[in-house]
Each structure stands twice: as structure tokens, then as C-alpha cells.
């Protein structure tokens, strides 16, 4: 009798795990193979993405920094070029990232759930278009490779954090 009860409990647990919805997905890597790896995976614990600082020159994206909640990530990339900064509105999220690349990331265009279109860089190279695989998910963090420029970029998607009331 105990064996039957354990079997039923095990089957119920396996069934519950199999129907648990998935929310995270990954897009990338777009760009070249150079540079040193970086990841903002730990930064997502500070909150949702709330702003971008992106340095561009006339050829490609040189560097980037992302604000998670109220905390800026470490800057990655080079120092040459113009620094552009854009803040998201409270509760606004990135739901699509498209752009161009060759050996470096040349362009990134962030599209938000409020209909805003935020372009950085130059439109030349191979196109990419990154969207989450699962509904009701947003851009949570960025990873990639960088040196004197942003060599490649990857986008990581998941649900908007429920613990951030002021973001």
C-alpha cells in the first residue's frame, strides 16, 4: 500500500512539473568572434531594464551600459565615439531587438511595449531580429563579447519582475 501511495505521489509530481510553463528564452549570438565575454545575468536581480547608454562611431557600436532598476551595469566596449543615453518610461519594457552586424555589432534597434522605436548605430551588414519565444516576456539582460567595440550581442528574455514597484 505504501508503494502505491509513493508511486501516485511521484506521478503527480512529475505531471505538475511537465505542465509548468516556461518563460525564459535566448536570442543570439549576433556578431563576430573577437573580444572578451561579458554577461549582465546578475544585474537582472537589480530590477528590469530601465535605460541604455550606447557609444557609437560612424561604423559600429563601440560600447554599452544598461541600467537595471536604478543600478547601472559595468560599461563594456571601447571609448571612441559618441555616447547616447535613453531612459525607458516607468513600466516600459523592450519586447524586440533588431539590428545589423558583421565582425562587430553595427546597429541595435530596441522596440518597446509602448510602441517606441529606439535606434542606435549604422544600418549596414547582416540583419538580425530577436524576439522572445514565450508570450508576456521581455528583455531581461544582455550578454556578448567586447573589446574596443561590441563584437557580438545576445539577448535574454523572461517575465517582468514582480518585485519592482518603482521601476
Curated annotation (Swiss-Prot):
It comes from the Eukaryota. Residues 24-159 form the Jacalin-type lectin domain. GO terms for biological process: defense response to Gram-positive bacterium; protein transport; suppression of symbiont entry into host. Keywords: Cytoplasmic vesicle, Extracellular matrix, Golgi apparatus, Lectin, Protein transport, Secreted, Signal, Transport. Coiled coil: none annotated. InterPro entries: Jacalin-like_lectin_dom, Jacalin-like_lectin_dom_sf, PolyBind_ProtTraffic. CDD domains: Jacalin_ZG16_like (cd09611). Its main location: secreted. Residues 1-16 form the signal peptide. GO terms for cellular component: collagen-containing extracellular matrix; Golgi lumen; mucus layer; zymogen granule membrane. It is found in: Secreted, Extracellular space, Extracellular matrix; Zymogen granule lumen; Golgi apparatus lumen. GO terms for molecular function: carbohydrate binding; peptidoglycan binding. May play a role in protein trafficking. May act as a linker molecule between the submembranous matrix on the luminal side of zymogen granule membrane (ZGM) and aggregated secretory proteins during granule formation in the TGN. Belongs to the jacalin lectin family. This is Zymogen granule membrane protein 16. The lineage of its organism: Eukaryota, Metazoa, Chordata, Craniata, Vertebrata.
